[in-house]
Amino acid sequence: MLRAFARLLLRICFSRRTLKIACLLLLVAGATILIADRVMVNASKQLTWSDVNAVPARNVGLLLGARPGNRYFTRRIDTAAALYHAGKVKWLLVSGDNGRKNYDEASGMQQALIAKGVPAKVIFCDYAGFSTLDSVVRAKKVFGENHITIISQEFHNQRAIWLAKQYGIDAIGFNAPDLNMKHGFYTQLREKLARVSAVIDAKILHRQPKYLGPSVMIGPFSEHGCPAQK
C-alpha cells in the first residue's frame, strides 16, 4: 500500500515538473517568435511601398520565387511587371528554387513576365535561390547588386530587407498584394517561424548561400541572361 502511494506521488510530481518545463519552453518559444517578428517589422519601416508612383526608382528589382501558378506567384509577377512598365526598375533578377527535377521557379517567373510584356533581354535568372537568404545575398555576391528593390508580399519583404541589412545590402521593398487570412493563414504561420530561423542563420550561424559561383553582370553588355530553358 505504501509503495503504491509512493509511486503515485512520484508520478504526480514528475507530471507537474514535466508540465512546468513544457510551459516554460512554450513561453520561451513564444517570446522568441514575438521578438523576431518585431525586429523585422521595425527594420523595414519606411522601406516598403505599395504605390508604384511613390516607390523610388532603382536599377534592379529582385523578384523572390514562389511555386509557379499559385496565388502568391501570380501576384508577384503582376507586381514586378507593373514596376518595370512604370520605369521603376530597369532590370529584373528572378531568383528561385531549381533544386528538384522538373521544378524551376526562375524559368517559370521569366516566362510569366514575358507574357506580361516584359522584354526577355531585361530578365536575369538566379537558379540557386533556394531560400530568401540565398536570393538576397547572391544578388550582391554573384550579380554584383548592392542597391535593390525586393519584390514580394509585404511580410516576405520585411524579412528579406532585414536579411539584406545583415549582409550589407541596401534594399527597399515593393509589396505585391497579399492573400486574405482565410487563404494565407498557413503561410503567415510559417513566416513567423521563418523569421526566427532567419535570425539564427544571420546572427548565430552567419550562414552563406548554398552556392555562389562565377560573377554575373546585370546590364546590356552581359553575356548571361535568362534563357527560356536553362
UniProtKB/Swiss-Prot annotation:
Subcellular location per UniProt equals:
Membrane
Q: Which InterPro entries match?
A: Cell_Envelope_Assoc, DUF218
Which keywords fit this entry according to its UniProt record?
Membrane, Transmembrane, Transmembrane helix
This entry carries the following GO cellular component terms, namely: plasma membrane
This protein's source sits in the domain of life called Bacteria
Q: Name one Pfam family in it.
A: DUF218
Q: Any transmembrane segments, and where?
A: 18-35
Where's it mainly located? membrane
Q: How does it sit in the membrane?
A: Single-pass membrane protein
* Family the UniProt entry places it in: To E.coli SanA.
What protein name applies here?
Uncharacterized protein YgjQ
- Organism equals Escherichia coli (strain K12)
Encoding gene per record: ygjQ
